[in-house]
Amino acid sequence: MEQTQTAEGTDLLIGDEKTNDLPFVQLFLEEIGCTQYLDSFIQCNLVTEEEIKYLDKDILIALGVNKIGDRLKILRKSKSFQRDKRIEQVNRLKNLMEKVSSLSTATLSMNSELIPEKHCVIFILNDGSAKKVNVNGCFNADSIKKRLIRRLPHELLATNSNGEVTKMVQDYDVFVLDYTKNVLHLLYDVELVTICHANDRVEKNRLIFVSKDQTPSDKAISTSKKLYLRTLSALSQVGPSSSNLLAQNKGISHNNAEGKLRIDNTEKDRIRQIFNQRPPSEFISTNLAGYFPHTDMKRLQKTMRESFRHSARLSIAQRRPLSAESNNIGDILLKHSNAVDMALLQGLDQTRLSSKLDTTKIPKLAHKRPEDNDAISNQLELLSVESGEEEDHDFFGEDSDIVSLPTKIATPKNWLKGACIGSGSFGSVYLGMNAHTGELMAVKQVEIKNNNIGVSTDNNKQANSDENNEQEEQQEKIEDVGAVSHPKTNQNIHRKMVDALQHEMNLLKELHHENIVTYYGASQEGGNLNIFLEYVPGGSVSSMLNNYGPFEESLITNFTRQILIGVAYLHKKKIIHRDIKGANILIDIKGCVKITDFGISKKLSPLNKKQNKRASLQGSVFWMSPEVVKQSATTAKADIWSTGCVVIEMFTGKHPFPDFSQMQAIFKIGTNTTPEIPSWATSEGKNFLRKAFELDYQYRPGALELLQHPWLDAHII
């Protein structure tokens, strides 16, 4: 009774609010049999659930709860309030999701039909409305856009510079909202086609379609969000069959709630999967229109036809089997044709075959004359080129035995430009195809302004190119966030981009190695400077890590061995790459490593060693060696350090010093801090990395020495 009176007296002192709260603390302590501590709780003003749920051992001791048993009972009960609170928050979130899901746009009924359909895509217009389009039969971005443009209301059509309404596909863009970073992503043509024809891409239900002179409006973005949430809600109700889709599109993460939808933070990478990975040549050959969306169809068809005939001619003249690794469109089509022919021949009755055919000629039957190839061309839909425009040539006439075969791929005089597949140190990289031979290429391209120099192919200009450029070289890879854009600065940067591309061209001329991208030539046309390089289907180490996560150690040793072989070749040629990193290491679909991007590479000469001038700061920060950061020396050993950083990338899926900014990383490296070596690496792997990260470059082993390290032999068997 005394306690009650005391409590009531205190209750009157602290006011009506506390009067209402007292029953809670009383019930709390009575439930666990600890009412003897009620006065202490009231005196310390610990009377509400919000205050009690944060109790800990020290607070209870201060309150005079000295018995361990009582402390345990109070703590267990208080922690249960936190769990109840989390459950309540989860329920609130679910209710909120249901309310949002119940929203609908004015022109679209959002129901279970939002589960991705094979041939249907939903485009959101800038007025917030949405249209469902059947894209069946549309195998390039232009045809998809045309099908939608025909259905656009007049007020949403684009206008040209003269203010006239236009229905040209190049006047429209397609965006998709990336919910991981709250940014709008402009789709490449290849990405648009890939998304539209994929069964497991829920982005196809919320593509935003606008004219080039506009950006997605708030109404369009709002509709996109509603469609996105409704799609996830519909997927969750479908059951196990949609589990993969949900796993790929989980959403909006909240640390204090469990068991709810999240947006996968790799969604943007998934959208750009084709962009990053460089699709295989055979995949491109089945959808050339999609990968060369801006190329005239007749010209593309003519190129395919000529490439097919050229491959047939060389195959018979050389008596050579077709290479499975060829990037030539004609070789791929001919290989498919031959495979069908051989299957048909093997299926013939052996008695009929022996009586009607000379078996010694069977292998040659796979190589058809161009006249016979017309039937195959019909299947490939190549015959839209009128027969009067191009007559069948007799490739196998009297002179067929004295055909002059090229020993290497010549610089293409005429080529077709395809989709953008990446970017290098300077400029963008496009998919290209030799218009005469059908050979696929990677074309590195930089726009040349009026006051820039043209392409120089004279070898004698290379000798002084490094010295002339050294004083002007920019620190291009280090992002200066505080830099102010200036017209003259931009002009100088653009000039250096062109110089770097010419410099890369001059270096690549000298390089012929399995682990270095092959140089096909260069040209200057249409205000652009082009370098034609070997097309490497597959992707970079960086893109593979983004898509698949860290590698197994056996795979790391395989790739590292090939990287070092390529680096050793470069160093033998007195060339320092200076930008070895995961993004510049390409892996083809056969697992062969190709080192690329020589935009800031340097060729050493005796003059380099005599000069006392300070070394320039070149490269990508997180892969830089201490001597590069300190600008104390220009040496091939910098590539060894960078190779070690690539090994770290492959082990962890992240670059070295992942928790630091670029300036912080520069400070760390400059103060002789080495990258952290993965604890799960084998002892040989750790030893390899310690050698690669030797701080003194004079004691750091070279590529040939590291190639003999036991770690690189440990996983060969």
Swiss-Prot record:
GO terms for molecular function: ATP binding; MAP kinase kinase kinase activity; protein serine kinase activity. Residues 415-712 form the Protein kinase domain. ATP binds at residues 421-429, 444. Gene3D superfamilies: Phosphatidylinositol 3-kinase Catalytic Subunit, Chain A, domain 1, Transcription Factor, Ets-1, Transferase(Phosphotransferase) domain 1. Residues 453-466 have a biased composition (Polar residues). InterPro entries: Kinase-like_dom_sf, Prot_kinase_dom, Protein_kinase_ATP_BS, Ras-bd_By2, SAM, SAM/pointed_sf, Ser/Thr_kinase_AS. Pfam families: Pkinase, Ras_bdg_2, SAM_2. Serine/threonine protein kinase required for cell-type-specific transcription and signal transduction in yeast. It is thought that it phosphorylates the STE7 protein kinase which itself, phosphorylates the FUS3 and or KSS1 kinases. This is Serine/threonine-protein kinase STE11. The gene is STE11.
